[in-house]
Amino acid sequence: MYSAKKILGLIGRNVGYSYSPYIHNTAAEKLGLGYYYTIFNISSHDLVPSALEGAKALGIAGFNVTIPYKKTVVACMDKLSPEAEAIGAVNTIVNDNGTLIGYNTDIAGIVIPLEPYASMIDAQPVGIFGNGGAAMAAIEALSTCFTPSGIRLFVRQREKGSELCRQFKDKNLPIPLSTHTLDDHTAQHNCRLLINATPIGTKGLDTAPAGSIIPSGSGVVHSGQIIFDMVYNPVETQLLQLAKATGAIAIPGIEMLIGQASRSFEIWTGKAMPVTTVRNKLQELLLTEKRSS
């Protein structure tokens, strides 16, 4: 008798580059679980509600959500976890018999790679590039799990950054939050930690510019910094290359990807992701891709 697998997937726009299917299918296969993870490309924000209604009808078990829909899906949820409600962004959805529950595991994906550097971050300014759902998760992670002296938000349009700052200040954020423009290189240089929470530098994403969020000749990056790039394809982005060239600590987006994926996997399946197996298999895949490119 045929036993249907439970379907999981990634909601996003032009996300064929994602390693999430490989990660989750590797984990499910290792544990012998009846899940299959795929990609659901949605072309525009206005199609998201009907897509999620269709998912309810089809009995799709759950989703990850990526750029640009982490905020869009919030209004479609029947319930929100405390962390998703706190930041107004969802990256993980559970379909519980037609009830959609939104979570945010990006926070875990940010905290886990940064934990070894907590003492470096303590009482020092930190910076985040971006004003979307990933940036919101970074603000929440840094303000609740670490003790920086302040969080600087670097954005292209200052009014959007100011709006985000107001949103967090209304929640009595325990750490000062300020808005700066992308060309404020002095403020960036003085940050102990810089996080790229934008898609800039992503390979194969038509909507994101190539290159680095920090220009190589800007003098921003130095050996006393931690550079965390949420972009994971390519594994070594131009920003991470710049970090390594200047002696800064470089944290690749793959670490965040695995961190948030492991938490999502546990929410869906009730099982701990076999992280060592997943990391080893992913590294093998990346090495193969690098050789063939």
Swiss-Prot record:
Active-site residues, record numbering mapped to chain: K70 (proton acceptor)
Lineage: Bacteria, Pseudomonadati, Chlorobiota, Chlorobiia, Chlorobiales
Reaction(s) this enzyme catalyzes, per UniProt: shikimate + NADP(+) = 3-dehydroshikimate + NADPH + H(+)
UniProt entry keywords in alphabetical sequence: Amino-acid biosynthesis, Aromatic amino acid biosynthesis, NADP, Oxidoreductase
Biological process terms in GO annotation: amino acid biosynthetic process; aromatic amino acid family biosynthetic process; chorismate biosynthetic process; shikimate metabolic process
Keyword match Amino-acid biosynthesis: yes
Annotated binding of shikimate, by residue: S18, Y19, S20, T66, N91, D106, Y232
Cross-referenced CDD domains: NAD_bind_Shikimate_DH (cd01065)
Gene3D superfamilies according to UniProt: Leucine Dehydrogenase, chain A, domain 1, NAD(P)-binding Rossmann-like Domain
NCBIfam families reported for this sequence: aroE (TIGR00507)
Pathway in which this enzyme or protein is active: Metabolic intermediate biosynthesis; chorismate biosynthesis; chorismate from D-erythrose 4-phosphate and phosphoenolpyruvate: step 4/7
Top-rank taxon: Bacteria
Protein name, entry field: Shikimate dehydrogenase (NADP(+))
Subunit note: Homodimer.
Enzyme Commission number, as recorded: 1.1.1.25
Function: Involved in the biosynthesis of the chorismate, which leads to the biosynthesis of aromatic amino acids. Catalyzes the reversible NADPH linked reduction of 3-dehydroshikimate (DHSA) to yield shikimate (SA).
